[in-house]
Amino acid sequence: RPELFITEQEQAAADNLLEKYRIDSREKVVGLNPGARFGSSKCWPPEYFARLAELLQEKLNCRLLLFAGPGEDQIAGTIMDRSKAEIINTAADRIDLAVLKPMISRCDMLITNDTGPRHYAVAFDKPVVVIMGPTDPAYTNDNLEKTVLVRRELPCAPCHRPVCPLSHECMTRIYPEEVLDAALMLWRQNVNES
């Protein structure tokens, strides 16, 4: 498993944000990472993330942290507008990759597209649900003990294109209920309910 280290400065910055968000150290936290620098083809529809957030709050006693990187404000905004769930949108705080490390390490689970933060979760031994569309899972087929890949087998996938030239079915045919099932399975197996 890869290792990541957190400096005192990075941890202090994350602690300040967690205090701002009023996240208690005893609360369970699920991180949602809806973006992908690679391109839109790796992004699960924000409307689906919005529905997933509602389902997670119905099923789990947890707080939801929405991580959004540079250029992902519109994705985060759509999720916030479409969801009835209580979601903490971190986009306005412009969390950089250094501070994202301790933020993800604080999460009890991460639900993400196939993008960099998934590897942070693996490095911190966190359960992670990866919604995978245009990429071949064989490229990252290591350290999957606490990882569930949710994907669709389609003739056009994996295409490895940043933008889908077709109808983006590799992502749009993965439904929130399916991702929820994967998350609930990982939660039961890995997250202490105490």
Language-model segments: residues:
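Mid-sequence helix-capping/hinge segment at a functional interface
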Residues: 1-41, 190
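A short acidic, often aromatic-flanked loop/helix-cap motif at beta-alpha or helix-coil junctions
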Residues: 5-8, 95-99, 155-158
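Glycine/Thr-rich phosphate-binding loops of Rossmann-like dinucleotide-binding domains
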Residues: 40-41, 74-75, 120, 138-139
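Short, solvent-exposed loop/turn segments at secondary-structure boundaries
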Residues: 41-45, 170
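Donor-binding and catalytic core of enzymes assembling or modifying cell-surface/extracellular glycoconjugates
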Residues: 46-133
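Nucleotide-sugar donor-binding patch of glycosyltransferase catalytic domains
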Residues: 78-82, 87-91, 122-193
